[in-house]
Each structure stands twice: as C-alpha cells, then as structure tokens.
C-alpha cells in the first residue's frame, strides 16, 4: 500500500503552532511514503515565511514534493514579482517548479499553475498540458498516476467557481485519456 500525506494552503506567516504540531504528530503516526505540498505554502512569499515552511517540511517523516501556489509569489513587491517571482520558493523549498516523483508503484507529476502576472486564477500552457499527458502515457500500467497543482478544477460552492483553473474543462479530460488516476 502507498501512503500519501497531502497538505495544501498552510500559509506560513499565519500558521498556528498547535496545528503545525498536530500535523507533525499525525504524519509521524501515519508514516507516509511521500508528502504532497500543493501550494500557498506562505501567506505573502516572504523569506522568513519560507524559512519556517522549510523547517516544518524538514520535520516530516517522508520526502516532500511541492508545487507553488499564488501566495508563494510576491504580491506587493512588484520588482520581485516581475524579475524573480519564484526566488524565495527556489531558495527555501525547491529549485524545481514542476517536480516528478517516480517509484515502482507511483508516478506523481507536479505542475506549476501560477502566473507571476496574475495573483489568482491559475493557468497552464499547452506545453505544460502536453508534458503531463506525455508523462502519463509513458507510465507503467501498475503505477498509480497522480498530477498535483495548486489551483482547483472543481468547486463545491458556487462562490468558489471564480477560483477554478482556467480551461480546466478541457485539461482534465486530456489527462484522464492519458491515464491519470488522481488530480
């Protein structure tokens, strides 16, 4: 059995110590094989927030595969947003914005759905969509195939529909056709 821990939107900078301690205890008890961290790791993409997130991730009992979220890009620091939008993310979390994890039973493909010119409403390029499709098609039949990204493709509440990934209605069927098991 493969055991995954999925964490999204911890928003370091607003984290509560008792919640972080409970998450670490839960992870230690469950002993996941891999942790998936799917964006909004920080509240305002500040170096100190990323340092705290890194310190937390280093305490997890499994490797961490992460993708950035819109809060992981500078919002008010326009120079940083334009010229080095992923600088703190790369310095503290991962140099890779679209990581891939593969084992004999698992393939996890990370996709960066953020755009420096936009604070919300994630988007994927045709190149990104095709890259994921190609990797999914190349997976072995006995591998669980997972795609991770920050922006949602479904909304339960009508008010959340404004936050959906742009063009999700055409992206998801392509990935399903390519063999995706979980998004």
Q: Where are each of the predicted segments found?
A:
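His/acidic metal-ligating clusters that form di-metal
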Residues: 28-34, 121-183
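Active-site neighborhood of phospho(di)ester-bond hydrolases with catalytic His/Asp-centered motifs
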Residues: 7-8, 35-40, 64-70, 112, ...
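Active-site environment of divalent metal-dependent phosphoester hydrolases
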Residues: 13-15, 43-48, 70-78, 115-120, ...
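Short, flexible segments with low predicted structural confidence
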Residues: 7, 29, 103-104, 147
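Extended active-site neighborhood of metal-dependent phosphoesterases/phosphodiesterases
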Residues: 51-134, 139-141, 170-178
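Alpha/beta-hydrolase fold active-site loops
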Residues: 2, 106, 143-146
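Short gly/ser/thr-rich secondary-structure transition/capping motifs
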Residues: 18, 89-93, 165
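N-terminal active-site segment of His-dependent metallophosphoesterases
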Residues: 1-59, 75-76
